[in-house]
């Protein structure tokens, strides 16, 4: 698998506990809005790892998205359900996924799928000694199983997709989660993210959407 393969395993494996820590310490809206910045980090990693140039359009996008993330971070100080610690965990997941997607591009001559169980099983084994994984399992078994199935399918597709499209394009598709997740959590769990999170998140999503629509219209 090589050093890059093991690095991929570490990046992907570490995102699961970091994601849980993010959701536990800040609002779901903050988490997914920060995730929306993944194309930006993917572009940066593609530049440093693959040598792909960063256009003026992307540089402007990076500037505006960074400002949007600052607005979200500020909102965490004004909202009881948000916290900057959770925002940092979400940012780590975002950066790790972007780096992992770029590594898939670099290793596109081989299938990275066999590395996924290594990554997640390794993460699960380590976490087993620090948690109580079977607490409440009987009561919530159906939720555990649904979560496992959805995560497994989504992760496999994420591992396959960047072999055929660029990592920024793959990251862009994840923006659908950014739009749907806060609305579902707000509707079902009544978790209002706060005006700062909504404003900063809207800035991030709209900037990325306009930036990429501009590219698609030129093709």
Specify the residue positions occupied by each region the protein language model found.
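Membrane-interface helix-cap regions at the ends of transmembrane helices
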Residues: 1, 17, 66-81, 121-141, ...
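Specific transmembrane alpha-helical segments of multi-pass solute transporters/efflux pumps
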Residues: 1-30, 35, 43, 70-71, ...
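Hydrophobic/small/kink-forming positions within alpha-helical transmembrane segments
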Residues: 9, 13-17, 39-44, 70, ...
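Hydrophobic transmembrane alpha-helices of multi-pass small-molecule transport proteins
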Residues: 12, 45, 57-76, 93-94, ...
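C-terminal transmembrane-helix exit sites in multi-pass transporters
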Residues: 19, 38-60, 179-199
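Structural signature of hydrophobic alpha-helical transmembrane segments
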Residues: 21-38, 82-95, 137-151, 197-198, ...
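Helix-helix packing/entry segments at the starts of transmembrane helices
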Residues: 31-37, 104-122, 152-187
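Transmembrane alpha-helical segments that form core, pore/gating elements
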Residues: 42-44, 78-135
